[in-house]
Curated annotation (Swiss-Prot):
Record has Nucleus as a keyword: no
Residues binding substrate: 11-16
Gene Ontology terms for molecular function: ATP binding; tRNA dimethylallyltransferase activity
Function of the molecule: Catalyzes the transfer of a dimethylallyl group onto the adenine at position 37 in tRNAs that read codons beginning with uridine, leading to the formation of N6-(dimethylallyl)adenosine (i(6)A).
Database matches in InterPro entries: Dimethylallyltransferase, IPT, P-loop_NTPase
Taxonomic placement: Bacteria, Thermotogati, Deinococcota, Deinococci, Thermales
Keyword ATP-binding: yes
Assembly: Monomer.
Gene Ontology biological process terms, A to Z: tRNA modification
Full protein name: tRNA dimethylallyltransferase
List of residues binding ATP: 9-16
Enzyme class, spelled out: transferase
Length: 302
């Protein structure tokens, strides 16, 4: 089977823009690999394509869950592979687009076949995380499996899941057998200079506040006062803290900007070690379109 194209890169590098522009020229359908765009109602803070844009260029795995529903890597993998197969069955080309590196890695490299989650153990671990802190629990995981510790990084949800598996089974996740990937992939990773990206991240955050992010989060908190995982996303968490009285609006914006820059740094680190058939394009946004099209012509005849 021919490979599936993947467009990856740090947040704000222009992935959605490039995919939408490509869709004006080529009959592609986007399969989103974004951990927050799956949620309905999280629109402004995720820079989600509008309904009009998605009507022009079909998107899969966007607006498929309510904010209180959990999205695991295993669930993403099942939904994404199903969407890719569906697009291929209709003679169209799926284009995987996103910056959630662990999702993309699971697609291209396979996923460890772990036991189903145990909500009771996870709840206890969340309480322990609150009491002991992330570093203490991460050190526990690192003693058992440095590979798993590197993989979960500073992500508390992945840390809780890894420790849950370890404590229940005595075996760290990395030692479980892997399910092989269903498709082959070729990846293009946008790699703009940080001096180009970071000012754009600041301007995007300010624009999101101006477009009504605070009102969007207020509405979500009214529906979900217990702050589900979806509302821990960058931007939403910082605005929620403001709305719950922890700090002012200006500080919420400053926290948002710091958080999104830190996330972009982690994405650079992650994608720097991306395995498989990978090309890095040292551009972002509109400047990257020519290189993106050249890559598609070379490898996919588009």
């Amino acid at each position: 089977m021919e490979a599936i194209p993947v467009l990856a890169g740090p947040t704000g590098s222009g992935k959605t823009f490039l995919a939408l522009r490509l869709g004006e020229e080529v009959p592609v359908e986007v399969v989103s690999a974004d951990a927050t765009m799956v949620y309905r109602g999280l629109d402004i803070g995720t820079d989600k394509p509008t309904p009009e844009e998605r009507a022009r260029v079909p998107h899969h795995l966007v607006d498929v869950l309510e904010p209180h529903e959990a999205m695991s890597v295993a669930r993403f993998l099942a939904l994404a592979e199903e969407a890719i197969a569906h697009v291929l069955s209709r003679g169209k080309l799926p284009l995987v687009v996103g910056g959630t590196g662990y999702y993309i890695r699971a697609l291209s490299e396979g996923l460890h076949d772990l036991p189903p989650p145990d909500p009771g153990v996870q709840e206890a671990l969340w309480a322990e995380l609150e009491a002991r802190g992330l570093e203490a629990l991460l050190a526990e995981l690192a003693r058992a499996s440095p590979e798993d510790a590197r993989r979960v990084g500073k992500n508390p949800r992945r840390l809780v899941r890894a420790l849950e598996v370890l404590r229940r089974t005595g075996t760290p996740p990395a030692r479980f057998p892997k399910r092989p990937p269903r498709f082959r992939y070729k990846k293009l990773v946008l790699w703009p200079d940080r001096a180009w990206l970071f000012p754009r991240l600041e301007e995007r955050a300010k624009a999101q506040f101006a477009r009504g992010l605070v009102e969007e989060v207020r509405g979500l908190l009214e529906r979900y006062p217990r702050m589900p995982t979806a509302l821990q996303a960058i931007g939403y968490k910082e605005v929620a803290g403001h709305l719950l009285g922890a700090y002012g609006l200006e500080e919420a914006l400053e926290r948002d900007i710091r958080a999104v820059k830190a996330y972009a740094k982690r994405q650079y680190t992650w994608f720097r070690h991306e395995p498989g058939d990978v090309v890095y394009l040292p551009r972002g946004g509109e400047e990257a379109y020519v290189g993106f099209r050249d890559w598609l012509r070379l490898h996919f005849g588009l």
